[in-house]
């Protein structure tokens, strides 16, 4: 039987602790995210990277292990407080992704891992406009997000066995993601999908995923600022 993390309606202290422990313990769910972010963003020493919706700071810290210079941002003060406690020496800021407290061209790259599904299209476009300001010309933006067409998400949508995360108000497939990014001034340079971490299902996804979107667990997109 599938067992999924059940996110609360709001991100409380327990949720932040869970996010942190999953990263520190390197759970299969975490490894899947880290692998996707690494492959998409290709972090290099000296890369200035803004991590949007950083939560407890897992991705921010992971990028720092490659010698990058990441900054994590999140609108939730509790998230930033916990990130600062866990990963001292790294920079974390309480900030709205549509109004970032950084100067123009402050970053080479940006990442949003399991974040854009929490915002609606108009906010997404506003965020892209802001990212184009804080990124250098031609800067890269990597996205890792749930695929609403995947079997698990369809089950959640129908409230069949699994319940939908109430904070997932902006689930998008790859085509929808591309349209919003283009509207926000980005050009998609790479688009792919990733299988899940559930052993039995993952085997099926690897075989069927190339042909059927029902078995594409995550949408992975790399876009470049125009």
Per-segment meaning from a language model:
Residues 2-3, 7, 11-15, 19-31, ...:
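S-adenosyl-L-methionine-dependent methyltransferase catalytic module, highlighting the catalytic core
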Residues 1-103, 109-113, 125-128, 170, ...:
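Conserved N-terminal segment of class I S-adenosyl-L-methionine
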Residues 114-118:
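Short catalytic micro-motifs in class I SAM-dependent methyltransferases
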């Amino acid at each position: 039987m599938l067992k999924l993390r059940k996110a609360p309606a709001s991100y409380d202290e327990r949720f932040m602790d869970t996010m942190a422990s999953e990263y520190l313990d390197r759970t299969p769910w975490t490894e899947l995210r880290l692998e996707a972010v690494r492959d998409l963003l290709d972090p290099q020493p000296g890369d200035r990277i803004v991590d949007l919706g950083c939560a407890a700071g897992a991705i921010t810290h992971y990028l720092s292990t490659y010698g990058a210079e990441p900054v994590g941002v999140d609108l939730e003060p509790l998230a930033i407080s916990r990130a600062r406690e866990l990963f001292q020496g790294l920079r974390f800021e309480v900030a709205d992704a549509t109004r970032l407290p950084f100067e123009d061209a402050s970053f080479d790259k940006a990442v949003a891992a399991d974040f854009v599904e929490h915002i609606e299209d108009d906010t997404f476009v506003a965020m892209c406009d802001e990212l184009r300001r804080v990124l250098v010309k031609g800067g890269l933006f990597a996205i890792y997000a749930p695929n609403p067409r995947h079997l698990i998400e369809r089950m959640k949508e129908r409230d069949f066995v699994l319940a939908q995360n109430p904070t997932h108000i902006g689930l998008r497939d790859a085509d929808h993601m591309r349209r919003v990014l283009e509207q926000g001034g980005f050009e998609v340079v790479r688009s792919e999908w990733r299988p899940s971490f559930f052993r039995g299902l993952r085997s099926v996804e690897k075989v069927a995923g190339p042909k059927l979107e029902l078995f594409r667990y995550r949408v992975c997109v790399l876009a470049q600022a125009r």
